[in-house]
Amino acid sequence: MAAENPSVSGVAGRYATALFELARDQKSVDAVKADLDRFKAMLAESPDLTRLVRSPVFSADAQGKALVAVLAKAGIGGIAANFLQLLNANRRLFAVHDVIRAFGALVAKFKGEATADVTVAEPLNDQNLDALKSALKSVTGKDVTLNVNVDPAIIGGLVVKLGSRMVDSSLRTKLNSIKHAMKEAG
């Protein structure tokens, strides 16, 4: 299955595929996804947790003890907790972000959904997010989950990546196009 979807390749893809197949067999795909999303949010909020996960300086034992405490505090248990502990035992915890992303792609494919990566200069409000989801749904015919990244460097507009397609309507790109046109004309 990992070979069918380019977004789930490599080590992260193999781990995500194994986790997905187990979760599907146990009929707990949604619960595992919710737990992994909670862990991903914790990583985004805590630089210390991110450092613990990514740094090879910590021993597997130290990471394991800290991970058990973090998972217990977050209420993450069952398959997701066992899986995260397996990643730690195999010294692959540094790849957890990519594994979670690949798992999400597998879940979306399983449910007939699409995932779009959207880059914006400023956070979008709920009304704009809903409008973007509706527009993408009308194009794809599928429910669309948005992964929104804020990057002030694009100045304005947005960049949408959906599968192998990308639409770049950022102000930065438009300004670069004008700059190149002026160089060629000048």
Swiss-Prot record:
GO cellular component labels: plasma membrane; proton-transporting ATP synthase complex
Organism domain of life: Bacteria
Protein topology in the membrane: Peripheral membrane protein
InterPro entries in the record: ATP_synth_OSCP/delta_N_sf, ATPase_OSCP/d_CS, ATPase_OSCP/dsu
A Gene Ontology molecular function term of the record: proton-transporting ATP synthase activity, rotational mechanism
Subcellular location: Cell inner membrane
Keyword Zinc-finger tagged: no
Alphabetical keyword list: ATP synthesis, Cell inner membrane, Cell membrane, CF(1), Hydrogen ion transport, Ion transport, Membrane, Transport
Coiled-coil intervals, chain numbering: none
Biological role: F(1)F(0) ATP synthase produces ATP from ADP in the presence of a proton or sodium gradient. F-type ATPases consist of two structural domains, F(1) containing the extramembraneous catalytic core and F(0) containing the membrane proton channel, linked together by a central stalk and a peripheral stalk. During catalysis, ATP synthesis in the catalytic domain of F(1) is coupled via a rotary mechanism of the central stalk subunits to proton translocation. This protein is part of the stalk that links CF(0) to CF(1). It either transmits conformational changes from CF(0) to CF(1) or is implicated in proton conduction.
Family: Belongs to the ATPase delta chain family.
Subunit structure: F-type ATPases have 2 components, F(1) - the catalytic core - and F(0) - the membrane proton channel. F(1) has five subunits: alpha(3), beta(3), gamma(1), delta(1), epsilon(1). CF(0) has four main subunits: a(1), b(1), b'(1) and c(10-14). The alpha and beta chains form an alternating ring which encloses part of the gamma chain. F(1) is attached to F(0) by a central stalk formed by the gamma and epsilon chains, while a peripheral stalk is formed by the delta, b and b' chains.
Name under which the protein is recorded: ATP synthase subunit delta
Organism in which the protein naturally occurs: Rhodopseudomonas palustris (strain BisA53)
